[in-house]
């Protein structure tokens, strides 16, 4: 059983954590994040640390305990250093370009796929087969990266598609002829 909920979240200097009812706000050098937290789990904000405590040990409360602690830790980490993901396009003629707040993917379909880049994220295209996604919210960075990857996920026979930078795609053997 995981006991991650009992670990203290360290709050570095220059980061401010505030709770107003169910809303928790974390302000730091890179920006501000707000998230709704359950009032079932009590949160003690002290000098440079935040502790979580649960009233009972039922399954729902135990799950919330660890989740809320992990969410707050990710918020603190995000406003201090941010999060980033890198995607690679593998395949002949697969290209990407960024025009303003639009990402244009040419990945083997008859028309290019256009995706709107969320306002809170920064997307850079250093070359035409690499996409760098960065932002302060771990969830938003991961969700947008997964959305882009889902446009053409890697296929198992040649490995063509959009993949995360360090993702390993297991190549399967094709059918053998008679």
From Swiss-Prot:
Any one GO MF term held by the record is: rRNA binding
Which terms does the UniProt entry file under GO BP? cytoplasmic translation
Question: Which NCBIfam families would you find in this protein's record?
Answer: L6_bact
Which SUPFAM superfamilies does this UniProt record tie to the protein? Ribosomal protein L6
The encoding gene is rplF
Which PANTHER family does this chain map to?
A: 60S/50S RIBOSOMAL PROTEIN L6/L9, LARGE RIBOSOMAL SUBUNIT PROTEIN UL6M
How it assembles, according to the record, is: Part of the 50S ribosomal subunit.
Q: Record's family?
A: Belongs to the universal ribosomal protein uL6 family.
Q: Which UniProt keywords apply?
A: Ribonucleoprotein, Ribosomal protein, RNA-binding, rRNA-binding
User: What is the stated purpose of this protein?
Assistant: This protein binds to the 23S rRNA, and is important in its secondary structure. It is located near the subunit interface in the base of the L7/L12 stalk, and near the tRNA binding site of the peptidyltransferase center.
The protein depicted here goes by the name Large ribosomal subunit protein uL6
Q: What GO cellular-component annotations does this UniProt entry give?
A: cytosolic large ribosomal subunit
UniProt cross-references to Gene3D superfamilies, sorted A to Z: Ribosomal protein L6, alpha-beta domain
Coiled-coil-forming residues are: none
